[in-house]
Amino acid sequence: MCGIVGVVGNTNATDILIQGLEKLEYRGYDSAGIFVVGDNKSQLVKSVGRIAELQAKVGDSVSGTTGIGHTRWATHGKPTEGNAHPHTSGSGRFVLVHNGVIENYLQIKETYLTKHNLKGETDTEIAIHLVEHFVEEDNLSVLEAFKKALHIIEGSYAFALIDSQDADTIYVAKNKSPLLIGLGNGYNMVCSDAMAMIRETSEYMEIHDKELVIVKKDSVEVQDYDGNVIERGSYTAELDLSDIGKGTYPFYMLKEIDEQPTVMRKLISTYANESGDMNVDSDIIKSVQEADRLYILAAGTSYHAGFAAKTMIEKLTDTPVELGVSSEWGYNMPLLSKKPMFILLSQSGETADSRQVLVKANEMGIPSLTITNVPGSTLSREATYTMLIHAGPEIAVASTKAYTAQVATLAFLAKAVGEANGKAEAKDFDLVHELSIVAQSIEATLSEKDVISEKVEQLLISTRNAFYIGRGNDYYVTMEAALKLKEISYIQTEGFAAGELKHGTISLIEDNTPVIALISADSTIAAHTRGNIQEVVSRGANALIIVEEGLEREGDDIIVNKVHPFLSAISMVIPTQLIAYYASLQRGLDVDKPRNLAKAVTVE
């Protein structure tokens, strides 16, 4: 949600800012803007809508050596040019961009800013006026005024501040919102995400919560809010320009769906050696062994991935697994077992709700494992342990390959722990072989895109509602399938256990209601699901059946190659991802950037 990019000391600041904002589009936004300063002149340009509209307004007229840019996803105030960032102080001297939510902005306004002319509706405007207030009223330097403001401001934030009288410095601070420093040769950068700086640098420096950074073209100094200097090393990010481009694909989502077989094979090479033995950190294995219950905490697609792996983990490790929605657990922690362990699933590693849970876990001394796609992310830094899903950059808002990679990574964890526990079922589960079969199954499904596209056009082109049904692991897949379809096609979709039809939901079935059924369990469960299909068809529903090989009947629509039951949630989700993609495409929607959604939810 929202994105920041800044550069100091480069003659090409405007182009770098625009290119950086384009790389941050996937995070979600409704307006954007840049501020550029240099050669004793400065310019501020903002627009509502896409980056292309901002770029058209900028044209060739905006130039400078230092600047900050921002994509805004509205939280306080409507998406207007006035509320778009960057924001200026009353005199226009100070310019600020901000991600996050200032919780005490009304108190600050009433205490310090009664004489200030506040023009917008945002909490960000409060912050920049507060800095100017301390410069003018307390006669403080910009740095000291910024520090004083940071001591007062409460909430989540990532700030980048420029004094238009000083074209050589960007002041940066963060708390609970992601922000990185990019180190260049004769210039330095600041950004919410390393991907926005990939063209300019591969060397980065982390900023921890409640740290202030003074960024100049040839130096970066990290301080705490009391002015104590903090030594901080840098690291190199393993990113490639080809990873963040669409290539020949029309949309990132389709590219990322197609990348899933490669991701499965990457995980095999990461978490298993050439002999097929598990290559999972022994400290992680020991910590899971010592737990009497595992709590998987996540949001959205990651939450569904946790459900998809729950039964497998329990059967392979003999350890009970409980699922929790991070946004609920952050404020309503239930009664826990005596020796709990938290597993946090997050593609970005920056999910604010999950971080709130992790903060509480750390306070309680509960061991934690983050499973994420982003090394160096907040959750990976603050958890006891981390496992990476190695899915590569996921740009489309609708997550696909991160889901399947999370399930596969949990499979490696479960097998490793089960073997350490001496479980015969874990030892007999040839995960390397079975996951290779999954990769082949995915490839087979991907070869049927034209068939799936035609089925979608017949079933979903004009509908307003749809249902997914399934039993066992298929039920867990229906939840993810429904989320995918609703978030990018805007079709109101519900996924539920097929056996629950008669307990209420069947009342919504009418003529031509689309019902998509998943069948991958054993023949007995499959027979029950087919009975449920007949119930909805007899009431006028149009049914589409996705069935695993060996359970198919004449008239079934999509056949998925058979895989090990522990991994069926991976193979069965692939056709549902394609269904969502084609439903969105055929409705003329922006597949990669659905309305009102952000890729990384970094505010609560």
Swiss-Prot record:
Tell me which UniProt keywords the record has, alphabetically.
Answer: Aminotransferase, Cytoplasm, Glutamine amidotransferase, Repeat, Transferase
The record places domain Glutamine amidotransferase type-2 at: 2-218
Q: From which domain of life does this come? A: Bacteria
Biological processes, Gene Ontology terms:
carbohydrate metabolic process; fructose 6-phosphate metabolic process; protein N-linked glycosylation; UDP-N-acetylglucosamine metabolic process
Pfam families to which the protein is assigned, alphabetical: GATase_6 (PF13522), SIS (PF01380)
One MF term in the entry's GO annotations: carbohydrate derivative binding
Q: Which EC number applies?
A: 2.6.1.16
Give the residues annotated as active site. 2, 599
Q: Does the keyword Membrane apply?
A: no
Spell out the InterPro entries in the cross-references. Answer: GATase_2_dom, GFAT, GFAT_N, GlmS/AgaS_SIS, GlmS/FrlB_SIS, Ntn_hydrolases_N, SIS_dom, SIS_dom_sf
PROSITE patterns documented for this protein: GATASE_TYPE_2, SIS
The residue ranges of the SIS domain are 284-423, 456-594
EC class: transferase
Its catalytic activity? D-fructose 6-phosphate + L-glutamine = D-glucosamine 6-phosphate + L-glutamate
Q: Which GO terms describe its cellular component?
A: cytosol
Q: Where does the protein end up?
A: Cytoplasm
* Primary location class: cytoplasm
Quote the subunit structure annotation. Answer: Homodimer.
Please describe what this protein does: Catalyzes the first step in hexosamine metabolism, converting fructose-6P into glucosamine-6P using glutamine as a nitrogen source.
- Entry protein name: Glutamine--fructose-6-phosphate aminotransferase [isomerizing]
Q: Which organism is it from?
A: Streptococcus agalactiae serotype III (strain NEM316)
